[in-house]
């Protein structure tokens, strides 16, 4: 196994890349504009932060993949559950950080679910049809984005800035294995000072059994899924300098689920809904830019465990969460060399729940809330020759329960020449305890403090006409991580976690038609926590649950002609550990290699046919102990554009 890993590292070092296409586009960094790194528009080569852009073109070459599966191919990211049955929990682990330590943004605004233990957002509620591009910014980003941004942020951008015609249509439909159908349509246009976008997407599948039939009885039923997403956005340019945008999104899905590890259940389902709405104002004149954002988000999750043969007990669980987010920030440039940014935000979250059992009656989780207010500021400096860039910033946060905390960011970078650049960062991050962790009747702890981290990283990047590569080393330290105490049965600040790692990515285009892309991630962790076998003493683990030490992705893309494109990709995931059960040793999950393929043919500007296949070898593997991962899956589809 060590020889295989060394071979993969060697290959990654020479022709590595992010498995999609920023990557494949070969666009120079001084032509890529990003906003997530510093909350202001800037060229990617002027920030020292580690940022990856997944473009609209890349997303369109993703076939029938989900958002979680696309993120799972990026360097340094593991989305555990992305390769399980539709509707299963998808947990984002960036650079090995625990669940809920990677902040999901929607057009720059935090997305949280206060009704969950870790407040992490359900990726099942997004579809690729909703997205124009994705910006991934790694490292502690709490200075600009607040709680949960310990490992980084993933900014899902839905705003299309390049709309000129009054009416445009894009639609895709596909059909595949397990009776899977995907349909989506987007209507958008610009009329006078108004710009509008409306999207609808639907995913339906018969699926496969979520739980693994370890006894081989072959009597586990398939667990189906049906989801819908509809969203709309309207922007009005009141003047040359001032615009306002309103948005509304409703996402819902119903998924059959099983009783647990190795355990089937025929009348058990989850019904998940989110309503997301808000508005933003933007004033931009000369060197001044002022942005105001407001977002209201309501999540409702309903679990229904119906009567089953031999189990005449009926139970339901309901969890409801509401968040309100307000933000106002402004940036000002001085002679294009110095940018000052100052802002503040207010976050209010509340949750309630109810449990009903035909055997035990009903109980309710009372409506409980928390709020936090922050002020933040940063300074960006660019030297006269644009070689040296420097960002420094800080945030002060006041939480209604635990009080005050602060963060900082120091981020220099240096462009040696047009090919080489160096960058580094020292930054702190934090995660506020969730409402559940504070107020739950049995496990809540009202004395919990914010989990704090310090992140160090340094890297080098190279690019020429045919090859580009980036290598990053990082180290993250947490001394008061939030964990569950198996002695007192309450949450407490206890975990000590140190994670060092290496990320390597590159793209190589030996000839015009061929692009080779690959990435490699290495984790070297130490986590001191309670012993999961005894639940009594303290132990230091040299691994992280469900997070492999080595991950390697590679993609070969061939543009055979202007109209025909084909790609083959592979993914290697090293062995990792998962929970073995209550007071049992952790279990080791085997490594695996998956082979995928994609092809598309454009009949003309308006019509494109595509086919994609995942796990071509039908490899049997597990992402989560006791749950099935996807078998061989294939989809064929057609895309229509009128624009």
Regions found by a protein language model. Name each.
Residues 155, 163-164, 189-270:
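Periplasmic-side early beta-strands and strand-to-turn transitions of outer-membrane beta-barrels
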Residues 383-388, 475, 494-580, 605, ...:
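Gram-negative outer-membrane beta-barrel transporters
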Residues 110-138:
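Short acidic/polar hinge/loop motifs at secondary-structure boundaries
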Residues 31-62, 91:
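N-terminal periplasmic "start-of-domain" segments of outer-membrane beta-barrel proteins
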Residues 67-70, 90-93, 105, 121-126, ...:
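N-terminal periplasmic accessory domains that precede
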Residues 68, 72-110:
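Extracytoplasmic beta-strand/coil segments of soluble accessory domains associated
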Residues 239, 335-341, 345, 349, ...:
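Structural signature of Gram-negative outer-membrane beta-barrels, strongest in the C-terminal barrel
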Residues 263-284, 319, 421, 425-479, ...:
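Outer-membrane beta-barrel signature, preferentially recognizing the C-terminal barrel domain
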């Amino acid at each position: 196994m060590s020889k295989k890993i060394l071979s993969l590292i060697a290959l990654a070092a020479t022709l590595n890349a992010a498995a999609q296409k920023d990557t494949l586009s070969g666009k120079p960094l001084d032509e890529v504009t990003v906003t997530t790194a510093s909350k202001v528009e800037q060229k990617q080569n002027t920030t020292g932060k580690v940022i990856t852009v997944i473009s609209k073109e890349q997303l369109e070459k993703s076939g029938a993949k989900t958002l979680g599966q696309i993120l799972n191919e990026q360097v340094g990211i593991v989305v555990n559950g992305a390769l399980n049955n539709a509707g299963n929990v998808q947990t984002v682990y960036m650079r090995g950080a625990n669940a809920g330590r990677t902040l999901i943004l929607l057009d720059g605004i935090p997305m949280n679910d206060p009704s969950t233990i870790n407040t992490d957002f359900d990726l099942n509620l997004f579809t690729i049809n909703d997205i124009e591009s994705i910006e991934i910014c790694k490292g502690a980003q709490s200075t600009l984005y607040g709680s949960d941004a310990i490992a980084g942020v993933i900014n899902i951008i839905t705003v299309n800035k390049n709309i000129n015609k009054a009416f445009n249509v894009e639609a895709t439909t596909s059909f595949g294995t397990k009776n899977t159908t995907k349909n989506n349509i987007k209507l958008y246009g610009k009329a006078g000072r108004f710009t509008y976008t409306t999207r609808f997407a639907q995913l339906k599948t018969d699926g496969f059994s979520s739980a693994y039939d370890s006894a081989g009885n072959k009597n586990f039923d398939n667990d189906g899924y049906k989801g819908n997403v509809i969203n709309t956005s309207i922007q009005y340019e009141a003047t040359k300098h001032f615009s306002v945008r309103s948005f509304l999104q409703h996402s819902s899905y119903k998924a059959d689920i099983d009783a647990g590890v190795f355990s089937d259940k025929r009348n058990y389902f989850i019904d998940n809904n989110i309503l997301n709405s808000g508005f933003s104002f933007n004033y931009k004149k000369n060197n001044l830019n002022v942005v105001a954002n407001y977002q209201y988000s309501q999540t409702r999750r309903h679990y229904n465990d119906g009567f089953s043969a031999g189990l005449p007990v009926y139970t339901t669980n309901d969890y409801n969460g509401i968040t309100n987010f307000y933000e106002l920030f402004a940036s000002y440039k001085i002679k294009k060399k110095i940018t000052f940014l100052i802002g503040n935000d207010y976050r209010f979250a509340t949750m309630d729940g109810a449990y009903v059992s035909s055997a035990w009656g009903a109980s309710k989780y009372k409506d409980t809330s928390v709020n936090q207010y922050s002020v933040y500021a940063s300074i960006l400096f660019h030297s006269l020759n644009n070689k040296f860039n420097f960002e420094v910033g800080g945030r002060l946060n006041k939480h209604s329960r635990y009080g005050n905390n602060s963060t900082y960011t120091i981020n220099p970078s240096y462009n040696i020449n047009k090919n080489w650049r160096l960058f580094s960062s020292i930054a702190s991050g934090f995660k506020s305890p969730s409402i559940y962790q504070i107020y739950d009747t049995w496990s809540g702890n009202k004395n919990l403090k914010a989990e704090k981290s310090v992140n160090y990283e340094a890297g080098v990047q190279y690019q020429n006409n045919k090859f580009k590569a980036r290598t990053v080393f990082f180290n993250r330290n947490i001394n008061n991580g939030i964990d569950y105490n198996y002695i007192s049965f309450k949450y407490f600040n206890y975990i000590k976690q140190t994670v060092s790692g290496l990320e390597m990515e590159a793209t190589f285009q030996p000839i015009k038609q061929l692009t080779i892309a690959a990435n490699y991630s290495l984790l070297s962790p130490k986590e001191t926590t309670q012993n999961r076998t005894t639940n009594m003493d303290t132990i230091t683990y040299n691994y992280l649950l469900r997070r492999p030490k080595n991950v390697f992705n590679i993609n070969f893309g061939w543009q055979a002609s202007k109209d025909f494109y084909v790609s083959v990709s592979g993914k290697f995931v090293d062995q990792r550990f998962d929970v073995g059960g209550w007071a049992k040793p952790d279990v080791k999950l085997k490594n695996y290699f998956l082979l995928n393929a994609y092809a598309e043919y454009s009949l003309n500007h308006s019509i494109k046919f595509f086919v994609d296949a995942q796990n071509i070898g039908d490899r049997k593997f597990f992402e989560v102990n006791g749950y099935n991962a996807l078998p061989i899956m294939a989809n064929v589809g057609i895309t229509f554009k009128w624009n």
